[in-house]
Amino acid sequence: AITYPALPSIRLAEPFEQLRDASDRMLAKTGARPKVFLANLGTVADFTARATFAKNFFEAGGIEAVSNDGFKSQNEMIAAFKASGAKLACLCSSDAVYETRAIDAANALKTAGAHVILAGRPKEQDGLKAAGVGIFIYAGGDVLGTLRSVHAMINLNPGAER
């Protein structure tokens, strides 16, 4: 008879739990979790789907999403970002709105000190990258790898103090 050693037991949720544990440690140390500001562009109909996706995406990694109902002006958006205390900002809207507003919004958020992320996978990314978008989140993307990169951006160490 042929015998093989048993496969090691793994829990697929464990890497995400490590990210949330890092968030819990930050909460215990500073009184606040890491935050991402949802920079919702356009109307509620334009941004709701991607804002909901982004909220769930980041919260799976222990990053609190700061939501809103959109903004009448870019200055209003930047003021809300600064007031949020977030280091991360995620642009959320439809592809049509991104075509006309995303580059200016990304530039403004980057100038305000944000690490800029965009919810979606637009065909034309070069202009967005040049404007400061560092990460694109979308269905089918590497959620765990992206969340680890985001944690590294804001100096969270998921493996510490386990």
Predicted regions and their residues:
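Active-site-adjacent beta->alpha loops and helix N-cap segments on the catalytic face
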Residues: 74, 97-107, 146
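Active-site-proximal beta-strand/loop segments in catalytic clefts of secreted hydrolases
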Residues: 93-94, 121
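Non-catalytic terminal/interface segments that mediate subunit docking, oligomerization
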Residues: 1-93
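Alpha-helical segments flanking ligand/cofactor-binding loops in enzyme cores
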Residues: 79-82, 103, 107, 126
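Flexible loop/turn segments at secondary-structure boundaries
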Residues: 43-48, 97-100, 124-126
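C-terminal accessory domains/tails appended to large, multi-domain proteins
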Residues: 62-64, 104, 113
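Residue-level marker for well-ordered alpha-helical positions
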Residues: 52, 75, 103, 122-125
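Peripheral docking tails and interdomain loops at the edges
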Residues: 107-162
